[in-house]
Design a protein with these regions (language model features):
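Short pre-active-site segment immediately N-terminal to redox-active cysteine/selenocysteine motifs
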Residues: 34-37, 42-45, 92
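Active-site-proximal beta-strand/loop segments in catalytic clefts of secreted hydrolases
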Residues: 41-44, 74-77, 99, 114-115
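Electron-transfer interface patches adjacent to heme c in soluble/periplasmic c-type cytochromes
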Residues: 84-91
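A short beta-strand-turn-helix
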Residues: 18-35
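Conserved redox-active cysteine motifs that mediate thiol-disulfide chemistry
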Residues: 41-55
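Non-catalytic, surface beta->alpha helical segment in thiol-disulfide oxidoreductase systems
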Residues: 91-134
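N-terminal targeting signals for export/organelle localization
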Residues: 1-16, 134
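Thiol-based oxidoreductase modules, predominantly thioredoxin-like and allied folds used
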Residues: 17-21, 57, 61-81
Length: 134
């Protein structure tokens, strides 16, 4: 009930971006717009994943704090092969993985594991943006 109410409230907020982006779409947007790619890996049966999404990711998207990154939210159960590749086999959920393009055309990877309040996510975003600007 609370998550439904939160979804309704957040859907009426005009600023920010949609959080539920498909990985392929988010990756493409990241490359085209030269933005860091933030991948949130979770599962619907994971309580910490639900709390992360509802109390950190969705409110940050609603206030525009995620506008400088391209965001993908991936359900571990829906795409286990992609999750295995992105997490490098790390099983802990949830995970926030930040990919930033480097000067050689490759991607640098930063990781937050477990539930995270807004401040560590803000720090991760700032770090990724600073790395992008070099």
């Amino acid at each position: 009930m609370v998550s439904l109410l939160l979804a309704l409230v957040l859907s009426s907020v005009p600023s920010g971006q949609a959080v539920e982006q498909d990985y392929t779409l988010a990756y493409k947007k990241s490359v085209e717009q030269n933005k860091p790619l933030m991948v949130v890996v979770g599962a619907p049966w994971c309580p910490a994943c639900t709390v992360l999404k509802n109390s950190t990711i969705m409110p940050m998207a609603a206030t525009g704090e995620l506008d400088e990154v391209s965001v993908a939210v991936i359900n571990k159960d829906d795409d286990p092969e992609l999750v295995e590749q992105l997490t490098k086999g790390e099983k802990m959920l949830p995970q926030i993985i930040m990919f930033t393009k480097n000067d050689t055309g490759g991607w640098n990877r930063q990781l937050l594991k477990g539930f995270q309040p807004k401040q560590p996510v803000r720090s991760l975003i700032r770090s990724a943006i600073a790395a992008r600007r070099g």
